[in-house]
Structure formats: structure tokens, C-alpha cells
């Protein structure tokens, strides 16, 4: 799954530390999500979308076969 977390984070002026704090996760979790090494749980993905005031589908993109 591709994602645009880094793009949205920078657009909103958040550091990785600040986003992690807002989501109550570690900075390493944010790094792993941004690098595509970790797919967040549904609740975490929904919270990320809520923070950026958008829908999950705008941030997380399913890779086409």
C-alpha cells in the first residue's frame, strides 16, 4: 500500500515528532509508515486522516495489480 503521509505531514507543517505525539505513537512508527515499511491499523489510519481533515483514501492508496 502506498501512502502520502509525508506529503500531508509537510503540507500541514508537522514534524515527525509532532505527528507521533498527536497520534500517541512513536516517531519510529511515523518513519516506518512514511517509508512504506508498516501499514497502520484501521483506527490509526482513520486518526491520521482526521488530523489532516481528509479521508483515508486520500492518504492511503492501494497498489493496483
Predicted regions and their residues:
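Short N-terminal alpha-helical targeting/association segments
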Residues: 1, 20, 26-29, 49-50
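Short, Lys/Arg-enriched C-terminal cap helix and immediately downstream tail that follows
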Residues: 8, 42-43
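DNA major-groove recognition helix of helix-turn-helix/homeodomain DNA-binding modules
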Residues: 44-58
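Short basic helix-loop element that most often maps to the first helix and adjoining turn
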Residues: 3-22
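Short, charged recognition helix plus adjacent turn
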Residues: 61-65
